[in-house]
Amino acid sequence: MNILVIETCALAKNVQFSDDDMIVSLVDGRTITVPLLWFPRLASASQKQLANYELLGDGEGIHWPDVDEDISVAGLLRGNH
């Protein structure tokens, strides 16, 4: 039996923060919520620094230049921290 596997790349479109979590909205409608404590640089950043992010590529990753943090969407989906 053959099984067709279609692999799609998860792409971020927006990042928001609550007091304790990072919320990443994906272009396919999914949302990833992870604790800020997983990323100490982000956990200690100011709201202004958190708001200053750049999507890398087509949204495969997220970069915060003020705190020198890079996170991949694929890594978030795998639970990497």
List where the protein language model places each region:
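Motif-centric detector for short Cys/His coordination patterns
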Residues: M1-H81
